[in-house]
Amino acid sequence: MHFFDTHTHLNYLQQFTGEPLSQLIDNAKQADVQKILVVAVKEADFKTIQNMTALFPDNLCYGLGLHPLYIQEHAENDLILLEQALKNRDTNCTAVAEIGLERAIPDLLTDELWAKQCHFFESQLYLAKQFNLPVNIHSRKTHDQIFTFLKRIPLSKLGVVHGFSGSYDQAKRFVDLGYKIGVGGTITYERANKTRQAIAKLPLDALVLETDSPDMPVFGFQGQPNRPERIVESFKALCTLRNEPAELIKKLTWENACQIFS
């Protein structure tokens, strides 16, 4: 079994480091990261990500979506363009991503922008339902609101609540709906006690691994762009929190990811 990095912005990692895409993928493969999901944050990413993944279809797949952090930039027409892109998608497109809600940034919490966030999230959930695709969800200080949307709009393919940070009870509600929990760099920090306890208690078949590269640096690499190969650090941290053998953890997190995004 291998590693599947279920959440990256590989296009931005390449832009940030200036390294050839082939080198980024080789580095990942040396750490046994055989599959990488590249997710969009705005409409301008769509073509870049499609072209990038077409070069390495055995290792890369992608998701198209409109991220809540960029809600001020998103136009209503972007939802139309997203629908068109999903309708014309190739087989490398395996998710609607990255979508979600954001309440950690005060500037995005005006009544107008919060309503727009909710509208874009709901619209993209319906697109995922329409095209029978899973979702990869951003949730920051919005677990209750996200849960309400997911319960109201059931999807056939479900998906992942990515980069989870929160309590066991919050995570368990998503798991009970059938969603997976994205485990990333947060658990490499001992101070993230609540999240570490949650990940330790959840069923292993509810977990997938991710890096969110170039974001969410793991402990020991603060201040550096995160990379798919550093999924190994999150895996090691996960193994210290779980009672299962490391090989079983690797096997099931791989299979869980493939079940959703392959």
Swiss-Prot record:
Enzyme Commission numbers on file: 3.1.-.-
Binding of a divalent metal cation 2, residues: 98, 138, 162
Lineage, opening ranks: Bacteria, Pseudomonadati, Pseudomonadota, Gammaproteobacteria, Pasteurellales
InterPro entries, sorted: DNase_TatD-rel_CS, Metal_Hydrolase, TatD-like
GO molecular function: hydrolase activity, acting on ester bonds; metal ion binding
CDD domains referenced in this protein's UniProt entry, alphabetically: TatD_DNAse (cd01310)
Protein name (Swiss-Prot/TrEMBL): Uncharacterized metal-dependent hydrolase HI_0081
GO CC terms of this entry: cytosol
SUPFAM superfamilies given in the database record: Metallo-dependent hydrolases (SSF51556)
